[in-house]
A protein has these predicted regions:
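Acidic catalytic motifs of isoprenoid enzymes
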Residues: 1-173, 182-200, 214-223, 240-243, ...
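Short alpha-helical scaffolding segments that buttress acidic/His motifs in well-ordered protein cores
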Residues: 178-181, 202, 269-273
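Membrane-embedded alpha-helical segments that form the functional core of polytopic membrane enzymes
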Residues: 198-208
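Conserved beta-strand-loop-short alpha-helix elements that form
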Residues: 208-214
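Accessory, usually C-terminal, subdomains that scaffold auxiliary metal cofactors
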Residues: 218-282
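Intrinsically disordered, low-complexity Pro/Gly-rich regions
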Residues: 288-337
Length: 337
């Protein structure tokens, strides 16, 4: 399973852990329902954010959950799982982006994909995922051609990139794809006024996804001779870190403009966990599973109880369920940790 937002469940409050798992399992089951058992392989942590965003804006309803049967990944327990348009959009996006990842590995001739028969089979699978994602996207009013076009442009940009090419030129297609996916959640939730700030949050999330993937793969790519945006453009890690920190700040600013019915899980994933993803990629954080002992990672502070879902009420703004408003004491107050 892949994705940059990979929270350790010990850091989530019990309620948020259940919610997060509901969206993760909901994505997996939406893939199976619409595209067959094999499609579940593309289940990923970042895709479920699309489902989380949709529900956070529309509000959770009893119709938005169903009880799933036993699953080995849940120790054969039943569980409530998310269903509906948010989960289906997450499935469509996950299929298209997984297709892009497969084609990227084929282009790099990674492992067995260096063999022509295996590469040909992988290309057929990727093409099938593109078509499947397009069908589901169309049923939801989302044109996955935006994602496919971005993926296709990526190859051309990488071919032309070299020393001195701005790194953000290379990340632009990914930014465009994730901006479109995030923005469409506003339309599914019936909150079109949220589309613009969510597009901005999605654009910066895509930038982070691309940069963190490059940072984490840098040494392996150098050893195998695979293309890496940092190496190709001559970008030092310090500049990549600066761009990541700027993007983190931009995501928070964009989410302040979004009207959520309940933004707690969004806040945990896109404020706290996204910061931890950056720290992890750059080797500036660790993860402790000791109960009752908070620790500091980067700029994030783990609460003493081992969770950091916002407590009852709203620590950042007056609107219930909206953790991105001005901090207590007005705009001049220090930012939350």
């Amino acid at each position: 399973m892949f994705g940059i937002v990979r929270p350790c469940t010990h850091r989530l409050s019990e309620g948020l852990r259940v919610e997060w798992m509901a969206h993760l399992c909901g994505l997996c089951l939406a893939l199976r329902a619409d595209h067959g058992q094999f499609a579940r392989i593309v289940t990923n942590y970042d895709g479920l954010i699309v489902s989380v965003l949709t529900e956070a804006q529309a509000g959770r309803t009893p119709e938005g959950r169903r009880t799933a049967g036993p699953c080995p990944l849940r120790a054969m327990r039943t569980a409530p799982v998310a269903k509906g348009e948010g989960a289906r959009l997450a499935a469509a996006v996950s299929l298209v982006l997984a297709s892009a990842k497969v084609r990227d590995h084929v282009a790099d001739r990674d492992g067995l994909l260096a063999r022509r028969p295996v590469a040909a089979a992988a290309r057929r699978v990727a093409a099938g995922w593109d078509r499947a994602g397009a069908r589901t996207g169309a049923a939801l009013g989302f044109d996955t051609a935006l994602l496919v076009d971005a993926v296709d442009r990526q190859t051309g940009i990488e071919t032309l990139a070299g020393p001195g090419t701005p790194l953000l030129t290379v990340t632009e297609p990914t930014e465009t794809a994730t901006a479109a996916a995030f923005a469409h959640t506003a339309h599914l939730a019936g909150k079109p006024q949220n589309a613009a700030p969510l597009a901005e949050a999605g654009r910066l999330f895509g930038r982070l996804a691309h940069l963190l993937d490059a940072v984490e793969d840098r040494e392996a790519d150098a050893a195998s001779g695979a293309w890496n945006p940092l190496t190709a453009t001559g970008t030092p890690l310090s500049e990549a870190r600066r761009l990541c920190d700027d993007a983190l700040h931009g995501v928070r600013l964009a989410l302040r403009e979004v009207e959520f019915a309940d933004g707690k899980l969004v806040h945990v994933l896109l404020a706290h966990e996204l910061r931890r993803s950056v720290d992890r990629a750059f080797g500036t954080s660790s993860c402790s599973h000791q109960e009752g002992q908070g620790h500091q990672e980067g700029r994030g502070l783990l609460l003493p109880d081992g969770s950091f879902g916002p407590q009852p009420g709203n620590p950042y703004g007056p609107q219930p369920g909206h953790p991105y408003g001005p901090p207590p004491g007005g705009p001049a107050a220090p930012p939350p940790p």
